[in-house]
Regions:
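Residue-level signal for inorganic ion chemistry
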Residues: 20, 44, 55, 92, ...
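N-terminal subdomain of lithium-sensitive/metallo-dependent phosphomonoesterases centered on the IMPase/IPPase/PAP
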Residues: 1-89, 175-179, 238, 259-277
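Short glycine/proline-enriched turns and hinge-like loops at secondary-structure junctions
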Residues: 76-78, 96-100, 130, 245-246
Length: 277
């Protein structure tokens, strides 16, 4: 893993982001549904195709598990040492609403842990990249800046800013967020954008107690936040297992600056989802 690897991922994510922007301004955007509350558009599929093709060309032999690919293409990824997890349009509902809160995410797993991640925000042009052991950066082409990022030093939940889903707000999540007693809880679309806010110290944590997110929602921000000095786990404190039997984050997702993590887990203990059978 080196800087050139991250630059290649950055380029692939950026190209997909530009393709999304071309469709973002379309007068109409037909929407299909994979399930209740789970929309998909031609933009999702176009970005998915561009990323998968780009990764296959740049890194042949590394399997790609991408949200809009056919599940049959995932076959064998459990046995591979390295695997890419891709969300080609993270925040489809926000894309449809045109509020700007969506991202492109590419993450790399080695063994069982996320080691590299890229989160690209097409509307602002900002990209966050990180690799465990190398560090994390915020790249802002418009400002001509590439700056290292680090999680915040706030160590009390009462002084913390928490970000949570804008579009997926269950009663259980609302109760869990209220139980934290944080300084503020802010709604924000896109798991990637929420994770990026934690990585650069704008927020102290991102909390999701449900099972709606998948491994491709977690992988890039897992690597990014870890590289920036934070911590990522499920609501029980266990690391995300990218080689597990399911692609769903069935026990939720907690992304933090690390200093507030244990306190958040303790407060969430009453809201832990039932153990999957």
């Amino acid at each position: 893993m080196d800087a050139s690897f991250l630059e290649t991922l950055h380029g692939i994510a950026g190209a997909a982001g530009q393709a999304l922007l071309e469709m973002y301004g379309a007068a109409s955007l037909p929407v299909d549904y994979k399930g209740p509350g789970d929309p998909v558009t031609a933009a999702d599929r176009r970005s998915n195709r561009l990323i998968v093709e780009g990764l296959n060309q740049a890194f042949p032999g590394i399997p790609v598990v991408a949200e809009e690919s056919e599940p049959a293409s995932f076959k064998g990824f459990h046995e591979a040492e390295r695997v890419f997890f891709v969300d080609p349009l993270d925040g489809t509902q926000e894309f449809i609403r045109r509020n700007g809160e969506f991202a492109v995410m590419i993450g790399l797993v080695e063994g069982r842990r996320a080691v590299a991640g890229v989160v690209d925000a097409p509307v602002t042009g900002v990209t966050w990249v990180g690799a465990v052991g190398l560090g994390a950066w915020r790249i802002d082409p418009e400002a001509g800046r590439r700056a290292p990022v680090r999680v915040s030093a706030i160590d009390a939940v009462a002084r913390a800013s928490i970000v949570a889903s804008r579009s997926h707000r269950s009663a259980r999540l609302e109760r869990a967020l209220a139980s934290l007693g944080a300084r503020e809880v802010r709604p924000l679309g896109s798991a990637g954008l929420k994770g990026a806010q934690v990585a650069e110290g704008v927020a102290e944590a991102y909390v999701d107690t449900g099972a709606s997110t998948k491994r491709w929602d977690a992988c890039a921000i897992d690597a990014l936040v870890t590289a920036a000095g934070g911590r990522v786990s499920d609501v029980t404190g266990a690391s995300i297992d990218y080689r597990g039997p399911t692609l769903a984050n069935e026990r939720g997702l907690v992304v933090s600056n690390g200093l507030t993590h244990e306190a958040i887990l303790a407060k969430l203990a009453r809201h832990v989802p039932p153990q999957p059978r």
